[in-house]
Regions:
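Acidic, small-polar-rich N-terminal luminal/periplasmic segments of exported/outer-membrane proteins
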Residues: 50-187, 560
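Outer-membrane beta-barrel translocator/receptor signature
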Residues: 152-154, 165-241, 249-253, 571
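Acidic/polar loop-and-plug regions of large Gram-negative outer-membrane beta-barrel proteins
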Residues: 225-229, 242-248, 252-318, 324, ...
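Structural signature of Gram-negative outer-membrane beta-barrels, strongest in the C-terminal barrel
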Residues: 246-250, 393, 410-424, 456-582, ...
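Face-selective signature of the C-terminal outer-membrane beta-barrel domain
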Residues: 311-334, 382-497
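Membrane-embedded beta-barrel scaffold of Gram-negative outer-membrane proteins
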Residues: 318, 324-330, 334-342, 528, ...
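Gram-negative outer-membrane beta-barrel transporters
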Residues: 476-479, 604-688, 762
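C-terminal beta-signal and adjacent terminal beta-strands/loops
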Residues: 678-688, 694, 720-767
Length: 767
């Protein structure tokens, strides 16, 4: 991961282009006010912001808070008026934590935590306990191996729970994490940033914005990474370039064009085995006797590569007085390859049929009286095998919305009508079996894998169509807000499996309602809300002759909560209770991780699940110097047998507090100090399913997870100095107290080991 020459050369080339440029505005956000050098008459003009855009500069409760969002209902709404839980991460949070991945910032939002993969791919997170893969960028959701580079992100809007009118439907019923990209603004500015550090650092970024004239603005953001992970020989190399152009036809109409290029390569590190002593009811630890940073994955032949191209269009206009329109489109093209070797799980224990608990060092009769007896150690040699999947998807997405805004002395109405279309094809979805020799974990030596037989070769296509209508009424001087929506969704799935000679297709549809109410007893200080919403996603048919995969996965949520904005708007607090029911939930089939893997790979498993619990969030700016964001979540996310899901921590919390010195303390003027603390509770380390042999119809005994990742609390320190002469230096110390922890896991043989204390330094020059 030391190949930096190309990145440095490209960075220098972009930097040298500065004199040719002249600036833009935040993602799905409005361009900033035009240059002050306009004539005096313009000072009296009113700039009308499209209801489909949000002002990225909004921070009415301090640096860490914005109370406007467009992600929940297609149009801009004050969060105090929303009947669904919505949270915003501002650019100040992203900058203060020097975010290397999106989760570095979103972990301060209630309900969001680490999932089953570590920090080196896919931005996989848990939202209200539901695993969410891939990315939502400017309202469009797509997959990939990459971690989205926060350098191109202006703000993050999180909508909790199912949402009937989002398109395409969210991949997780827990919610949607929408990353709003940086967009052209009508002013001139630029910034160059360089970061160096021990691990997960060594990067450079460039952001140049130019207001060309009253009608045109341009912006280019570029970022280059050459990271070394803490694990031996592992790293990430990434290039992201995002040019954008905005043309303003008038104050009521503008179009923005963007292109995002991403080139990604990361070591496919999957972790180390658990110690054989790990069981359901004790504290798990990494296998003893080996370095915690040991990697048994050779970066030269066990890796993920992903090259993505995104072409985007956003057009907003006022068609007639009170009638607004938004047209947004994306063409997404990606090529992916990821040879993956899975380490076999040792038989170092078994589940007790009478309890379902995994007991290390024991075996049990599967017939009465289900007695146990010791087994010998499984040894320290591990077999492994896997596949080398390739994907070549192409996606076309279109969203078209129309809003009619009406207001008089007694009522304010927002009527929305919208349409959406998504088409995805992947005619390069294939993989071979790959094999590598067994390895002794005490004397590991890299040995290249060899390719075996073809595992699968698929031709996949799917289509999504949506039409929706939504109405929001504000009554009694905005004291009572009612909203309702209905969405009609049509799906078409086609899958041809060349290895098995099977073709399946289905065309389900769904009618999804949503409604809510907001009551504001006292002005804009207290907001009480309730909402109900549904969503659905289509499932890919199975590769077997009998298609047993349900065509749709559906989710329903009831949510209620309260928001308070106090202390002259310096304090914002929210508490919410949610109850989500999901049917036909898809989870990876653990049998695909066996050695050798099934040929072809088995379809996912499906289960129903419920999630219910409480979330608490705080934003505060008690003084002009102090900014705070914090959250705590306590919930249950279980299957029908009341068994927890792999990687889901049912308790989590985080707080970030920043203090900025100014001229009131001359000796420290310009310094900023922040402390971030995040906690994740115990969570299952592997997926458990089914019942034990001792179960009866009246006494079912579910299998329990074989081990749990222990809870952990990490503390991060930030010290920064903002010069009066355009430059900033910042030191981030991650995991200050050097806590040893398990970051995530796939099963007993693949546990991501957490990074120890890590120092990262960032220098930024603004012009």
């Amino acid at each position: 991961m030391k190949n930096t020459c190309k990145s440095v050369a490209a960075f220098a080339l972009l930097a040298s282009a500065w004199p040719l440029w002249a600036q833009t505005a935040p993602a799905e956000t409005a361009p900033a006010a035009e240059p002050a050098a306009k004539d005096a008459k313009n000072k009296d003009e009113v700039v009308h912001l499209s209801p489909f855009l949000v002002n990225a500069g909004d921070s009415s409760v301090g640096r860490y808070s914005s109370l406007e969002s467009t992600s929940g209902g297609r149009v801009r709404v004050n969060i105090m008026d929303s009947s669904q839980s919505v949270s915003v991460i501002t650019s100040d949070v992203l900058n203060d934590v020097a975010a290397g991945r999106i989760l570095d910032a979103t972990k301060y939002i209630a309900g969001i935590s680490e999932s089953t993969l570590g920090s080196n791919a896919q931005d996989r997170t848990n939202v209200r306990g539901f695993q969410a893969d891939g990315h939502t960028v400017d309202g469009f959701t797509y997959g990939g191996f990459i971690n989205l580079d926060p350098a191109i992100v202006d703000r993050i809007e999180v909508v909790k729970g199912p949402n009937a009118i989002l398109a395409p439907q969210p991949t997780s019923p827990g919610g949607t994490v929408n990353n709003a990209t940086k967009k052209p603004m009508f002013k001139n500015f630029g910034a160059v940033s360089v970061q160096v550090g021990q691990f997960d650092a060594n990067s450079a970024s460039l952001d140049i914005n130019q207001g060309i004239d009253d009608h045109m603005a341009a912006r280019v953001v570029a970022s280059f990474r050459d990271w070394d992970n803490w694990w031996q020989g592992a790293g990430i190399r990434q290039t992201t370039i995002m040019p954008g152009f905005t043309y303003k036809f008038s104050d009521q109409a503008q179009v923005t064009l963007q292109y995002i290029y991403t080139d990604w390569k990361s070591t496919l590190y999957l972790g180390l085995p658990a110690d054989p002593s790990a069981g359901t009811n004790n504290t798990a630890r990494i296998i003893a006797g080996v370095p915690r940073d040991l990697s048994v994955y050779n970066e030269n032949d066990i890796y993920r590569i992903d090259q993505q191209h995104d072409w985007k269009l956003l057009f907003t206009a006022e068609l007639w007085k009170g009638i607004q329109m938004r047209l947004s489109a994306l063409y997404h093209k990606t090529s992916q390859y990821a040879p993956q070797l899975n380490t076999s799980v040792h038989t170092d224990g078994n589940r007790d049929p009478l309890t379902g608990d995994f007991v290390p060092g024991m075996q049990f009769l599967q017939v009465p009286p289900y007695t146990g007896s010791p087994i010998g150690p499984a040894g320290r040699t591990f077999t492994r095998s896997g596949t080398d999947p390739r994907n070549d998807p192409r996606q076309t997405m279109i969203q078209n919305d129309y809003a009619y805004l009406f207001e008089n002395d007694s009522v304010k109405s927002t009527t929305l009508v919208g349409f959406a279309f998504t088409e995805t094809t992947d005619y390069g979805n294939m993989a071979h079996n790959i094999n590598a020799p067994a390895f002794d974990i005490d004397h590991y030596v890299d040995v290249p894998w060899t390719m075996g037989t073809l595992n699968f070769d698929n031709r996949l296509s799917n289509q999504f169509k949506q039409a929706y209508v939504s109405e929001t009424l504000s009554l009694l001087k905005n004291r009572l807000i009612l909203n309702g929506a209905i969405s009609q969704n049509y799906y078409r799935q086609r899958a041809r499996y060349l290895v098995t000679g099977v073709f399946h297709g289905n065309a389900p549809d769904a009618t999804l309602p949503a409604y809510g109410v907001v009551i504001k007893p006292y002005k804009d200080v207290l907001s009480l809300y309730y909402s109900y919403s549904e969503q659905s996603t289509a499932n890919q048919p199975s590769n077997s002759a009998a298609n047993t995969v349900p065509p749709l996965t559906s989710s329903k949520q009831n949510e209620f909560g309260a928001r308070a904005k106090l202390w002259d708007d310096k304090l914002y607090f929210t508490v919410s209770y949610f109850d989500i029911v999901q049917d036909n939930f898809s989870v990876p089939n653990p049998a695909n991780l066996t050695t050798p893997p099934p040929n072809p790979l088995l379809p996912p498993l499906f289960s129903d699940r419920t999630a219910k619990g409480w979330e608490y969030e705080l934003r505060a700016n008690p003084t002009k110097h102090l900014s705070i964001i914090g959250s705590y979540t306590a919930f249950k996310n279980r299957d029908p047998n009341d068994v927890e899901f792999r990687g889901t921590a049912e308790k989590s919390g985080a707080v970030l507090a920043s203090y900025k010195f100014d001229a009131d303390t001359p000796a420290l003027d310009g310094f900023r100090v922040a402390i971030g603390v995040d906690y994740i509770g115990d969570r299952p380390g592997d997926a458990a399913s089914g019942l034990t042999a001792a179960s009866t119809p009246t006494n079912p005994i579910p299998n329990q997870p074989s081990f749990y990742l222990p809870s952990r609390t990490l503390t991060n320190l930030i010290i920064a100095y903002d010069s009066k002469k355009h430059w900033t230096v910042q030191l981030n110390v991650d995991n200050v107290f050097d806590e040893e922890y398990m970051m995530a896991s796939i099963n007993r043989s693949m546990i991501y080991v957490g990074t120890p204390t890590n120092f990262r330094g960032t220098f930024t020059y603004k012009f």
